[in-house]
Structures are given as C-alpha cells and as structure tokens.
Amino acid sequence: MLERLSEAFKIQRQFTENAAHELRTPLSLMQIQLDLYNSGKHPGNDADTIQTIKMLTEQNERLSKMVKTLLDMSELQTVGRDEMIIVNALIDEVLADLEPLAQEKNIKLIGKCKDVNMVGSDILIYRLVYNLVENAIKYNHYGGQVIVEAYQKEKQVYLSVEDTGSGIPEELKERVFEPFFRVDKSRSRELGGVGLGLALVNEIVRVHDGSIAIRPNPSGGTIIEVQFAVNRTTAVSYTHLRAHETSQDLV
C-alpha cells in the first residue's frame, strides 16, 4: 500500500514538473512580446486597450511566478540538506530583505531570535522564512507588526511568525497549506498571490522531516509555528549558497 502511494506521489510530482516545463516556454515568449510592446509608445490606444494590455502583462507575470514555484516544489527533494544553518543570522537577513515591503504598510518587523543552529538546506530554510514573513506582511493591517521568533528547546528548533492581521478562520486552518488555496481569494488576487507560498513552505518542512501548525493567538492575527530536529543528519561546514537577488523571485 505504501509503495503504491509513494509511486502515485512520484508520478504526480513528475507530471507537475513536466507541465511546468511545458508552460515556461510559451509564457516566456508572451512576456517578451509584452515587454517589447510596453517599451514603445502607442498614442492611438484607447483606455480599454491600455487596460487590456496591463491585465495581460500582470496575469502573464502571475502565471510565470506560479510555474517557477511549481518547478521549485518538484525539485525540493534533490536539494542537499546537510548544511549547518545559523538560524538567527538567516532570519536577520530575511527581515532586512523584506523591510522595504513592510515600510509600504508601516509594519514593524521584530526579531526575537536566540542563537540557534540546525542542519538542513540554507537556501530552502531562507525561502521558508521569507515566504512566511512576506505573507504576514501582505495580509497584515496597516501599521501592524510581524514578530519572528526562533529558539531551541531540548533537541528541537522552534520557529514562529506572528502577525496582527485578521487571522484565519478555524475551519480553514487545515487547508491553508494546500496548493492554490486562498483564505480570501479577492484579496490574494489584489496582492498578486498565486496560492502556492504556504504550499511551498509545507513542502520545505516535509523534506526536512519537520512539522508546521497554526497556533491559537488570543490577541488576534495568525501564528504559524515550524518545528525541526536540531540534528537530522551529520552536519558539515556552514555554507551560504543563496545569491542575494534570489529573494526577488520568491512567491
């Protein structure tokens, strides 16, 4: 039974990867044509044409992000996960990278991180934290705050991201990590989301043999907590594989 289930998941991942690869080329060609058109002047265009071109450009960019995330999800298993990660330093970097986005909504980013190390993939854990904090900013109230906390208890690393937004309805908490699921579809479209950010987070947690949950927050907002074992494999030297500009392409 387990072998059949594993094979089914393997086929599903392969299909997703193949579909994403097939979509990438036509989307790139459309983006090139749209970029060429947008780089020129078209004084004869009426308001409807301008709006249509704008919509096509935005939707093509959205689909391109979706394809990139699907490819990332299909390739997670191939990424090495034996680096020693300085978690508090990584979180500081994420907060610095997302500070401009937070400033747009006057949101305060707060790091409460003790000296914590764990074994895993530096580039994947960065993306996990980035996606969680980015979500917490996007779905927060203007003038709110985002608190990122990391600490070690016994042989477990705990990482949590808390926001002061509207929170997630109890009946939807089990579904927020599903691909393409959105709590508020209209708001997600407005913010440019494709419904894969938390699904990618969930997959990163899975390949690190961790767990993720939404914790109760009496003061409102959302708390997402991730838990990892400190030493899931034998550690090797700490390396920083991610180029700084990688963060600009995240979903």
Each model region followed by its residue ranges:
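Short helix-loop "hinge" at the ATP-lid/N-box region of the Bergerat-fold HATPase_c
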Residues: 136-137
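Short conserved segments within the C-terminal catalytic ATPase subdomain
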Residues: 101-110, 116
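Short beta-strand/loop element within the Bergerat-fold HATPase_c
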Residues: 143-155
